[in-house]
C-alpha cells in the first residue's frame, strides 16, 4: 500500500508519525510533499526515513490513499496542481477542517472515493480520537483499510458528515482546550506559593494517574468524582467554587463556539 501526504503540517506529521510507529506500513511506502519548502521537507523526510517528491505524476500514479493535509485556504491551488494526474485508483483522505466532501470533489473534478477524518495531535503517541465520514462510493474493503490506518494512531468514531462539526469541537480541538485548563491549573497552583517546576511535574503526574483511573475503571467519571468527594471536605469546597463560576456553561460555550466556527468554514468556499 502506498500513501501520499500533501501537506506536512502539525496534524499531518502526527498522523504519519503514528502510522510509522505502528509499523503497519514500511516507511518507503509513505511519500511526503508540501507547497514549496523543499529543504524543510527533505530534512523531515530523512528524519522519518520516508520518501519525498514534488513530481505529482509520480506520486499519484500508483498511490492507494492520498492524504489531503494542506491549509483549507490553500486547497484550491493544491487541487489545480494534482488534478491532471489523478487516476481511478486514487482514494482521498482529507484532514482539512471545514471542507465538505462535495466541495473537495468539485475542486478535484473527480468522483473518486473521499473520506474526511478529524484526528487530533495525540495521533503522534497513538492515542488520537478520530472522527471519520465516507463518501457514498467508498467500498467496504476500502473502508476497512482506512479504519485500519486510522486505528494505527488511535481510536475511530464513524459519523455522518454533518456530525463532524461536533467531533471537531469535542476531540479535534480537545487537546488544546485541555492544555489550556491544565495551564491555568499550573498558574493557580504556583500562586499558592509552590515552585512552578514542582507544580508542573505534580500536575503532569496527576493527569497521567487520573487518565489511567478513567481507563481502567468501569465507573463513570461522575461516579469516580463522587467517590473522592467527602461532604464538607476540601474537595467539596473546591468543587463548590467551580460551581459558582458555572464551569458547565463555560465548556458549553467553548464547544459551541468551535462547532459554530467549523460550520462557518464549511460554508465558506474561500477558506
UniProtKB/Swiss-Prot annotation:
It is found in: Cytoplasm. Catalyzes the reduction of 1-pyrroline-5-carboxylate (PCA) to L-proline. SUPFAM superfamilies: 6-phosphogluconate dehydrogenase C-terminal domain-like (SSF48179), NAD(P)-binding Rossmann-fold domains (SSF51735). Belongs to the pyrroline-5-carboxylate reductase family. Pfam families: F420_oxidored (PF03807), P5CR_dimer (PF14748). Its EC number is 1.5.1.2. It catalyses: L-proline + NADP(+) = (S)-1-pyrroline-5-carboxylate + NADPH + 2 H(+); L-proline + NAD(+) = (S)-1-pyrroline-5-carboxylate + NADH + 2 H(+). The keyword Cytoplasm applies. Pathway: Amino-acid biosynthesis; L-proline biosynthesis; L-proline from L-glutamate 5-semialdehyde: step 1/1. The keyword RNA-binding does not apply. InterPro entries: 6-PGluconate_DH-like_C_sf, NAD(P)-bd_dom_sf, P5C_Rdtase_cat_N, P5CR_dimer, Pyrroline-COOH_reductase. HAMAP family: P5C_reductase. GO terms for molecular function: pyrroline-5-carboxylate reductase activity. One of its GO terms (cellular component) is cytoplasm. This is Pyrroline-5-carboxylate reductase. One of its GO terms (biological process) is L-proline biosynthetic process. Keywords: Amino-acid biosynthesis, Cytoplasm, NADP, Oxidoreductase, Proline biosynthesis.
Amino acid at each position: 500500500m502506498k500513501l501520499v501526504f500533501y501537506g506536512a503540517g502539525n496534524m499531518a506529521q502526527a498522523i504519519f508519525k503514528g502510522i510509522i510507529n505502528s509499523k503497519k506500513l514500511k516507511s518507503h511506502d509513505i511519500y511526503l510533499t508540501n507547497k514549496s519548502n523543499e529543504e524543510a521537507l527533505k530534512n523531515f523526510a530523512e528524519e522519518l526515513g520516508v520518501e519525498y517528491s514534488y513530481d505529482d505524476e509520480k506520486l499519484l500514479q500508483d498511490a492507494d490513499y492520498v492524504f489531503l493535509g494542506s491549509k483549507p485556504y490553500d486547497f484550491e491551488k493544491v487541487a489545480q496542481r494534482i488534478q491532471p494526474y489523478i487516476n481511478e485508483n486514487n482514494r482521498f483522505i482529507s484532514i482539512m477542517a471545514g471542507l465538505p466532501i462535495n466541495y473537495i470533489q468539485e475542486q478535484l473534478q473527480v468522483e473518486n472515493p473521499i473520506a474526511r477524518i478529524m484526528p487530533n495531535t495525540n495521533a503522534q503517541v497513538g492515542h488520537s480520537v478520530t472522527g471519520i465520514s465516507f463518501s457514498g462510493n467508498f467500498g467496504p474493503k476500502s473502508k476497512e483499510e482506512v479504519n485500519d490506518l486510522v486505528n494505527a494512531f488511535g481510536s475511530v468514531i464513524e459519523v455522518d458528515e454533518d456530525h463532524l462539526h461536533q467531533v471537531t469541537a469535542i476531540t479535534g480541538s480537545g487537546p488544546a482546550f485541555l492544555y489550556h485548563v491544565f495551564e491555568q491549573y499550573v498558574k493557580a497552583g504556583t500562586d499558592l506559593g509552590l515552585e512552578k517546576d514542582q507544580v508542573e511535574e505534580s500536575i503532569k503526574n496527576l493527569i497521567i494517574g487520573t487518565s489511567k483511573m478513567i481507563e481502567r475503571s468501569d465507573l463513570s467519571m461522575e461516579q469516580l468524582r463522587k467517590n473522592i468527594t467527602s461532604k464538607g471536605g476540601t474537595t467539596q469546597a473546591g468543587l463548590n467554587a467551580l460551581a459558582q463560576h458555572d464551569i458547565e456553561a463555560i465548556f458549553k460555550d467553548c464547544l459551541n463556539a468551535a462547532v459554530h466556527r467549523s460550520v462557518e468554514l464549511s460554508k465558506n468556499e474561500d477558506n
